[in-house]
Amino acid sequence: DILAAFRVTPQPGVPPEEAGAAVAAESSTGTWTTVWTDGLTSLDRYKGRCYHIEPVPGEETQFIAYVAYPLDLFEEGSVTNMFTSIVGNVFGFKALRALRLEDLRIPVAYVKTFQGPPHGIQVERDKLNKYGRPLLGCTIKPKLGLSAKXYGRAVYECLRGGLDFTKDDENVNSQPFMRWRDRFLFCAEAIYKAQAETGEIKGHYLNATAGTCEDMMKRAVFARELGVPIVMHDYLTGGFTANTTLAHYCRDNGLLLHIHRAMHAVIDRQKNHGMHFRVLAKALRMSGGDHIHSGXVVGKLEGEREITLGFVDLLXXDFIEKVRSRGIXFTQDWVSLPGVLPVASGGIHVWHMPALTEIFGDDSVLQFGGGTLGHPWGNAPGAVRNRVALEACVQARNEGRDLAREGNEIIRXACKWSPELAAACEVWKEIKFEFEAMDTL
């Protein structure tokens, strides 16, 4: 069975058992009345069952309802169908004030019907010939308004300075100021020029997201013809059907696939209604993607440390134990489905490097947008600065030093032999993004 953990907030006067049973029925075989066609099938075989209810600590009106769904209810290899069944209709149910899907346990038999990520972590490292450290990325800013040529120049400078990847922003598709084909051509030129100068393999996440699946595939095919290593997709706005289609193409044609989670906070930000990001992350691993943005723990975008580490494990590890402190309600066996690299991004800069290296480990992409392009001397020195800081942190960690306690000292020591790093440390020494969370609903 597929197991689901729902956070249920019943209407006043509705007992939790009734609310849990209603969720199970409405998201499987139930309807609002008895129908004569019920007699034509074996409902006992197909109906969802609420098998356990427990209170949420500290919340009088909320309960966790555990529901089991028979596997026969789901089409093989279709995340779209899985979500349509489990969360398609039940969230507007009048007996509930609010409902949140906290976690899913995907059984081994169902996992094996999915191809998963096009390549996975190890194959990506082999393709790029980069080992023993996190990968470095940068989103090109300003995200909208640059011409294709000026955009390509920014890409070249960042890659030449020492980054592994640069990135289209999620909303860069094919706008009047920069059509997709021009951007792809100038970015490919930047990649090849930077590779020739540095001797390293470089990439730029070319955003293939489009208004139709046909246009999306046309862009992916053009990227492959240019010989670039990676394309990108906005998987929530683009949809799971489009994402799985693109992932299959990428595996068959040797392209890596970077996934952006634009729109996720619409679904996952409220604490008592919607769907937790760990469910969206599991779904992405099944649908297919080699990288996905996972929050930063530090920086400007929200991400609580333990919870973030919980879905970083879900993305990368093969077997994940149930750990309630990390919000993981079920053990999950991925049966060797390839892993996904978590991408840390959002308001991070050089002083965050020790914390990011410690928290995310080697199998991650650290993405500094403003933290690269905001360098007072320009893009290439910004990239140099990030690469120097990363190498210093990785070396210190490998020597057994404590990055949590000695992080600032490690960065300061590296400043002595990197003027680019020293200049940036001076600029960003005081910047913090510390706001109280407003969404306490």
Curated annotation (Swiss-Prot):
Catalytic residues (UniProt): 141, 260
A single GO molecular function term of this UniProt record: magnesium ion binding
Presence of the UniProt keyword Mitochondrion in the record: no
Cofactor note: Binds 1 Mg(2+) ion per subunit.
Site (Transition state stabilizer): 300
UniProt-annotated binding residues for Mg(2+): 167, 169-170
Binding site for substrate: 89, 139, 143, 261, 293, 345
Co-factor requirement: Mg(2+)
Cross-referenced NCBIfam families: PRK04208.1 (NF003252)
Misc note: The basic functional RuBisCO is composed of a large chain homodimer in a 'head-to-tail' conformation. In form I RuBisCO this homodimer is arranged in a barrel-like tetramer with the small subunits forming a tetrameric 'cap' on each end of the 'barrel'.
Family, as annotated: Belongs to the RuBisCO large chain family. Type I subfamily.
Protein name: Ribulose bisphosphate carboxylase large chain
Originating species: Symphoricarpos albus
